[in-house]
C-alpha cells in the first residue's frame, strides 16, 4: 500500500545540481543526524528574556531566530536557502540504499519515503535564518561570534546585575530606563535623621543664601559634561516632585563647573529667601540634562538629591523644639499605610513585568504553538504510517507463509511439510524484522530530537513507544518541595525584587525603599516559620489525645482539634488560634470589628453544646437507675451528700468524662439536680454578661479619659492663645508708650530749636535798631536839618528842644 501520496514532493531545482549527484551510505546519514542533534543541543533559548538580547548585526538586517543553521554542504559551498540541501540529499540517498538492500519488501520503501519527507518538512519549518548571515562550515556554527549558540547578552553591553551600561552616541537623547548619572557627594551644614510615616530619611540642613556643593559623576563613558547642558530645579519632597513656585525671584541659584575629563560635574547651589509658609518643609534639588534647543528633559539623565531643610541661621540647628510623643495608634496607622503603599508598588511592578513579558513574547508564543501543532501532526502521521507499514508487512508475511506451505505440501510428506513450514516462517520473520529495524533506525537518527519510535515487533502485536526529548516537553518544569513550596517561591520573589533597579522618580530613596520591602518580606517569612512550628505542635497534641482511646474519647467534634471530649491542651490551642486571628485581623481592618461578636457566638455555641451533653448524661443515668433495684433507705442521706457534691463540682465531672452512680435517686432529687444545673448555667451566663458589661465600662472609661485629655488639651490651647493675646496687647502698649515718648522728645527738640532761633534773632534786632538811630542823628550846626526833616519830633528821638 503506497503512503507517499500523503506528502508533497520536494523540488530540488532551487538547491542547485547537488541533489541528483550526491550519494551516501546509511552510516554517513546516521552520523550527519547525530552531528545535527549535537549542534542543536548546544543551543540554549530563553524566551522570556528575548527583549534583552543584543542585536550585533547592522541596523538594516533583521535579528536571527534562536535556531542553528544546517546549511553546510560537504564540499564547503555556501547555500542561502531556508533549508539545507544536505538534509534533502541524505534523505534521498536513504531511499536509494534502502531500495537496493531490501528489494523483497516493497512497503519498506514507502516507510522510508514517509519518514524522510517528514524530516524535510520539519527542517523547512524550523530552519529559517536570513540569507548570507551564516557560513557553511560546521565549525562556524559554534565558533563564529554571530552564531546563535552563544550565551544571551544584555543590551548596551552590560549584564543583568550591572548598574551601568554603555551605549552609542546616537542613543544618548533617546536613552533607556537605566540611570547613567549619579550623585557622588552632597555637602551640608548638618545631616539629620528624620522619620515620617515609618520611613526614615537623612535630611541635609542648609543655611539660606549660603552655598553648598553637589558633585555628579557619569556612569556612561560615552557621555561628557562638556557637551551636556544641565538644569537644576527646586522641588518639594513628595511623590509628585512638584516644583517650588516663585513670583519674581527664583528660589534657587546655581553655578556649574566640569573637570577637564568631563566625567564629573560640580554644582554650587544657593537657596534664596523662602516664604514663611514653607518653613519646616523638606525640599529636593532635581538635576536634569536638557536639550539646548527644545529645553526638554532627556530620559535617563536626571537625578534627585537627598531631602534638604533650609534654616535662616546656623544657631537654629542647635535649637530643636521638643516634640510631643505620638500615640501608639497613630504609629500603627502610619505603619499600616506604609505597608499598603509598598503593596501597591509591588503590584504595580509585577503588572509591569507581566505586561512587558506578554508584549515581548507574543511572537515567540505564537511560534511555539505552531511548532507544537506541527510536532503533534508529525507524531500522529508517524504512528499511522508505522501501523500501516506493519500491517502490510504482516499481510505479506502471511502470504509468503501460505505460499511456502503450499509448495512444501506438494513436494514433501506431511511431517516434512510441518518442519519446512517452521523453518520458512523463521527465515521470513527474520528478514522482515531486520529490514524494519534498519528503516526505523534511519528514521530515528534523523528525528532523534523530536520523537523516538521503537518498533519492538513486526508481527500482529506492534508496540510503538514515543519518547519526547528535553527540547520539546521537559522544559520549564519547576520542582518544588511539598512543605517549603510557598516559602521558597516567596524567597525567590524577594531575591528578584532586590535585583530590580530603582524605577521610581525618587532616585535617592529608591534603594532604601527596596531594603525596607525586603526587611518586611523577611519578617513575613519568619512569621510563616512560626506558624509552621505551631502547627507541628498542634499535630503533636492531636497524636497525644488520639492515643488515649476509651471512655475519655467520643465522637469527633469539629470545633476541637482532637477526638477527646475534654482535651487537656484545648486552652493552649484556643489561645494560639485567637492570637492568629488577632494578628491577621490587623492586616484586614474591615474585618477587625467582627472579631468580638464571632468570639461571643462561639462561646454561646460552646455553652449550648455543654448543656446538651449534660442533659444527655442525665437521661442515660435515669435509664440506668430505672433498670437497677431500689436499695435501703438508710443510704439516702449518703446519696444526698454525694448529689450535693456532684452539683457543686460539675466541671470536674465533665473533665473526667465518667459518672458512676451505684445508688437509687428519687425523681425529686433529679428535679433538684436539673434545677441546680440550670442555675449554674444561668450563673455562667450572668457572669459572661457581667464580664461583657465590665469590658464595655472599661471601654467607656477609656473613651471618657480620652475626651478629658482632649478637653484638657483644648483648655491648654485656649490658655496659650490667651497668653499670646496678652503678650500681644502688652507689646502694643509698649509700642504705643515708646511712640508717645518719641513724640514728646521730638516736640521738646522742636521747642529747643525754636528757642535757639529766637535767641539768635534778638541781637540782630538790637543791631538794626542801633543802626537806625545812628542814621537818624541830626547835625544841629547845619541849617539843613530842618529842611530835610520838617516834621521831625525831637521827643521821639530822645532829644529835648532847646
From Swiss-Prot:
Matches recorded under InterPro entries: CudA-like
PANTHER family: REGULATOR CUDA, PUTATIVE-RELATED, TRANSCRIPTIONAL REGULATOR CUDA-RELATED
Annotated keywords: Developmental protein, Differentiation, DNA-binding, Nucleus, Sporulation, Transcription, Transcription regulation
Location in or out of the cell: Nucleus, Nucleoplasm
Free-text tissue specificity from the UniProt record: Expressed in the prestalk cells that constitute the slug tip (pstA cells) and in prespore cells (at protein level). Not expressed in the band of prestalk cells that lies behind the slug tip (pstO cells). Highly expressed in pstO derived papilla cells during culmination.
Disruption phenotype: Mutants fail to culminate. Development is normal until migratory slugs are formed, but slugs lacking cudA fail to culminate in the dark or in low level unidirectional light. In overhead light slugs lacking cudA eventually form defective fruiting bodies that lack both mature stalk cells and mature spore cells.
MF terms in GO: sequence-specific DNA binding
Protein name, UniProt field: Putative transcriptional regulator cudA
A single cellular component GO annotation: nucleus
Composition skew (Low complexity), residue ranges: 25-63, 89-128, 381-445
Gene Ontology annotations of biological process type: cell differentiation; cell surface receptor signaling pathway via STAT; culmination involved in sorocarp development; positive regulation of gene expression; sporulation resulting in formation of a cellular spore
Induction remark: Induced by acaA in the slug tip. Induced by dstA in prestalk cells, but not in prespore cells.
Biased composition (Polar residues): 69-88, 129-142
Disulfide cross-links: none
Function: Essential for normal culmination. May function as a transcriptional regulator.
Region (Disordered): 1-148, 154-173, 381-446, 636-658
Amino acid at each position: 500500500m503506497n503512503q507517499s501520496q500523503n506528502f508533497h514532493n520536494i523540488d530540488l531545482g532551487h538547491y542547485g545540481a547537488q541533489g541528483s549527484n550526491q550519494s551516501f551510505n546509511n552510516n554517513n546519514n546516521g552520523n550527519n543526524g547525530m552531528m545535527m542533534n549535537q549542534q542543536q543541543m548546544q543551543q540554549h533559548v530563553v524566551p522570556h528574556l528575548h527583549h534583552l538580547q543584543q542585536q550585533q548585526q547592522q541596523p538594516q538586517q533583521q535579528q536571527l531566530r534562536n535556531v542553528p543553521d544546517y546549511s553546510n554542504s560537504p564540499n564547503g559551498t555556501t547555500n542561502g536557502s531556508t533549508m539545507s540541501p544536505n538534509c534533502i540529499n541524505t534523505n534521498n540517498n536513504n531511499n536509494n540504499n534502502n531500495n537496493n538492500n531490501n528489494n523483497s519488501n516493497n512497503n519498506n520503501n514507502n516507510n522510508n519515503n514517509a519518514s524522510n519527507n517528514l524530516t524535510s518538512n520539519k527542517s523547512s519549518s524550523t530552519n529559517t535564518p536570513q540569507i548570507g548571515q551564516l557560513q557553511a562550515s560546521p565549525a562556524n556554527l559554534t565558533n563564529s561570534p554571530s552564531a546563535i549558540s552563544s550565551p544571551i547578552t544584555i543590551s548596551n553591553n552590560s549584564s543583568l546585575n550591572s548598574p551601568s551600561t554603555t551605549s552609542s552616541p546616537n542613543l544618548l537623547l533617546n536613552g533607556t530606563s537605566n540611570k547613567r548619572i549619579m550623585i557622588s557627594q552632597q555637602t551640608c551644614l548638618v545631616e539629620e535623621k528624620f522619620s515620617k510615616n515609618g520611613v526614615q530619611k537623612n535630611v541635609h540642613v542648609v543655611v539660606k543664601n549660603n552655598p553648598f556643593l553637589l558633585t555628579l559623576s557619569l556612569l556612561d563613558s560615552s557621555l561628557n559634561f562638556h557637551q551636556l547642558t544641565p538644569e537644576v530645579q527646586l522641588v518639594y519632597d513628595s511623590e509628585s516632585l512638584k516644583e517650588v513656585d516663585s513670583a519674581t525671584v527664583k528660589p534657587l541659584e546655581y553655578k556649574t563647573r566640569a573637570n577637564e575629563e568631563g566625567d564629573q560635574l560640580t554644582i554650587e547651589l544657593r537657596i534664596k529667601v523662602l516664604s514663611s509658609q514653607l518653613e519646616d518643609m523638606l525640599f529636593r534639588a532635581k538635576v536634569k540634562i536638557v536639550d539646548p534647543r527644545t529645553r526638554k528633559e532627556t530620559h535617563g539623565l536626571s537625578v534627585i538629591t537627598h531631602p534638604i531643610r533650609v534654616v535662616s541661621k546656623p544657631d537654629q540647628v542647635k535649637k530643636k523644639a521638643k516634640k510631643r510623643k505620638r500615640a501608639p495608634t497613630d504609629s500603627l496607622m502610619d505603619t499600616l499605610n506604609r505597608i499598603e503603599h509598598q503593596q501597591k508598588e509591588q503590584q504595580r511592578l509585577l503588572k509591569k513585568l507581566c505586561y512587558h513579558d506578554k508584549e515581548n513574547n507574543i511572537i515567540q508564543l505564537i511560534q511555539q504553538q505552531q511548532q507544537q501543532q506541527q510536532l503533534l501532526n508529525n507524531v500522529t502521521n508517524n504512528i499511522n504510517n508505522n501501523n500501516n507499514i506493519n500491517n502490510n508487512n504482516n499481510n505479506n508475511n502471511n502470504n509468503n507463509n501460505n505460499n511456502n506451505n503450499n509448495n512444501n505440501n506438494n513436494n514433501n510428506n506431511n511431517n516434512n511439510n510441518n518442519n519446512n513450514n517452521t523453518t520458512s516462517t523463521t527465515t521470513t520473520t527474520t528478514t522482515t524484522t531486520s529490514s524494519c529495524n534498519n528503516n526505523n533506525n534511519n528514521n530515528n537518527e534523523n528525528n532523534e530530537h523530536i520523537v523516538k519510535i521503537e518498533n519492538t515487533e513486526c508481527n500482529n502485536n506492534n508496540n510503538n513507544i514515543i519518547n519526547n526529548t528535553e527540547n520539546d516537553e521537559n522544559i520549564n518544569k519547576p520542582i518544588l518541595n511539598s512543605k517549603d513550596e510557598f516559602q521558597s517561591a516567596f524567597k525567590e520573589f524577594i531575591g528578584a525584587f532586590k535585583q530590580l533597579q530603582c524605577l521610581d522618580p525618587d532616585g535617592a530613596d529608591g534603594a532604601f525603599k527596596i531594603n525596607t520591602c525586603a526587611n518586611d518580606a523577611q519578617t513575613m517569612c519568619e512569621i510563616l516559620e512560626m506558624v509552621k512550628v505551631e502547627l507541628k505542635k498542634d499535630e503533636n497534641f492531636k497524636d497525644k489525645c488520639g492515643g488515649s482511646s476509651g471512655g475519655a474519647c467520643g465522637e469527633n467534634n469539629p470545633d476541637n482539634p482532637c477526638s477527646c471530649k475534654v482535651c487537656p491542651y484545648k486552652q493552649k490551642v484556643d489561645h494560639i488560634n485567637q492570637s492568629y486571628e488577632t494578628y491577621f485581623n490587623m492586616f484586614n481592618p474591615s474585618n477587625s470589628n467582627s472579631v468580638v461578636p464571632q468570639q461571643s457566638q462561639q462561646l454561646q455555641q460552646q455553652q449550648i453544646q455543654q448543656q446538651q451533653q449534660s442533659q444527655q448524661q442525665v437521661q442515660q443515668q435515669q435509664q440506668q437507675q430505672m433498670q437497677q433495684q431500689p436499695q435501703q433507705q438508710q443510704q439516702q442521706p449518703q446519696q444526698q451528700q454525694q448529689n450535693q457534691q456532684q452539683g457543686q463540682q460539675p466541671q470536674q465531672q465533665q473533665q473526667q468524662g465518667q459518672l458512676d452512680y451505684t445508688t437509687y435517686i428519687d425523681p425529686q432529687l433529679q428535679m433538684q439536680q436539673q434545677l441546680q444545673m440550670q442555675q449554674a448555667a444561668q450563673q455562667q451566663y450572668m457572669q459572661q454578661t457581667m464580664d461583657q458589661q465590665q469590658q464595655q465600662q472599661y471601654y467607656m472609661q477609656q473613651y471618657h479619659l480620652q475626651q478629658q485629655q482632649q478637653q484638657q488639651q483644648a483648655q491648654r490651647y485656649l490658655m496659650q492663645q490667651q497668653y499670646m493675646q496678652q503678650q500681644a496687647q502688652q507689646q502694643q502698649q509698649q509700642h504705643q508708650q515708646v511712640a508717645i515718648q518719641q513724640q514728646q522728645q521730638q516736640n521738646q527738640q522742636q521747642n529747643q530749636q525754636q528757642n535757639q532761633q529766637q535767641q539768635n534773632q534778638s541781637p540782630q534786632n538790637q543791631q538794626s535798631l542801633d543802626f537806625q538811630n545812628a542814621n537818624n542823628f541830626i547835625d544841629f550846626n547845619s541849617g539843613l536839618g530842618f529842611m530835610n526833616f520838617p516834621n521831625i519830633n525831637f521827643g521821639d528821638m530822645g532829644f529835648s528842644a532847646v
